[in-house]
Design a protein with these regions (language model features):
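ABC transporter nucleotide-binding domains
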Residues: 3-8, 13-187, 192-193, 197-206, ...
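Signal for well-folded cores of large energy- and translation-related assemblies
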Residues: 81, 175, 220, 236-241
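Conserved beta-strand-loop-alpha-helix hinge in the C-terminal portion
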Residues: 209-233
């Protein structure tokens, strides 16, 4: 097994009487797509906030690239790209200004790749960020998260609420990043069909606890019913007892 990009050991986080993460342990080696799946409130975003160094571990430990993200934020964040569902970009900037602004923080910024992504995502350079649709903002956020070719890309529900075409664009960019450059992606979502399309490894989290964490093919093989291989949706129901999302939700 290759060196772990993320190493989490017995991580626990409580907010008052609520246990958001309960002795969570994960090891993510380099060069694959990891799907982190669970319902809203399951602990996905809290886990990601620890990885980003936004929360300090109350118990247990978090290491990213072998570093403590709280103690060494520059050493971690300079090698990490991040896109969230909120995608809070400065609305007063134009797209080209957003690119130039972000570029200044990353010596490894790849101008040619940024231009390629801009064309792929059909983003008008002179357009104000505030005038972009939700889907266009997601593409702009993904562009600036990818263009410096981070070793680790963390996506927290990046396509929630977006139309299928935009989701396909985002997933396509993830696949290219991994397939072409051998980088690592941690992809958080409650859309299990989406995760099945791109993930090599899947971690299911429920009520702050890890239910299962393994290669997707191993998870599906271990949940075979006769000759039929269950989908992730069906596996989640088998593990938890209720669907992740109600039909049509």
């Amino acid at each position: 097994m290759s060196e772990a990009v993320i190493e989490i050991s017995d991580l626990t986080r409580r907010f008052g009487a609520t246990t958001a993460l309960d002795a969570v342990s994960l090891s993510l080696p380099r060069g694959a797509v990891y799907g982190l799946v669970g319902a809203n409130g399951a602990g996905k975003t809290t886990l990601i906030r620890h990885i980003l160094g936004l929360l300090r571990a109350q118990a247990g430990s978090v290491r990213v690239f072998g570093r403590d993200p709280v103690a060494d934020p520059v050493g971690v964040l300079s090698r990490l790209g991040y896109l969230s569902e909120d995608n809070d970009l400065p609305g007063w900037m134009r797209v080209d200004e957003l690119i130039r602004y972000t570029r200044a923080f990353y010596p490894a910024w790849d101008d040619a790749y940024a231009e390629e992504l801009q064309k792929t995502f059909a983003l008008e350079p002179s357009a104000k960020v505030r005038s972009l649709s939700k889907g266009q903002k997601a593409r702009a956020g993904l562009l600036v998260a990818l263009a410096y070719r981070p070793e680790l890309l963390v996506l927290d529900e990046p396509s929630s609420g977006l139309d299928p075409i935009v989701r396909r664009d985002i997933l396509g960019a993830i696949i290219r990043t991994i397939a072409d450059e051998g980088r690592t992606v941690l992809f958080s979502s409650h859309l299990l069909q989406e995760v099945e399309q791109v993930a090599d490894h899947v971690t299911m989290i429920h009520a702050g606890r890890i239910l299962v964490s393994a290669r997707l093919d191993e998870i599906r093989e271990s949940h075979r019913v006769g000759d039929r291989v269950l989908s992730l949706d069906e596996i989640f129901v088998a593990r938890v007892g209720t669907p992740l999302r109600a039909p049509g939700a």
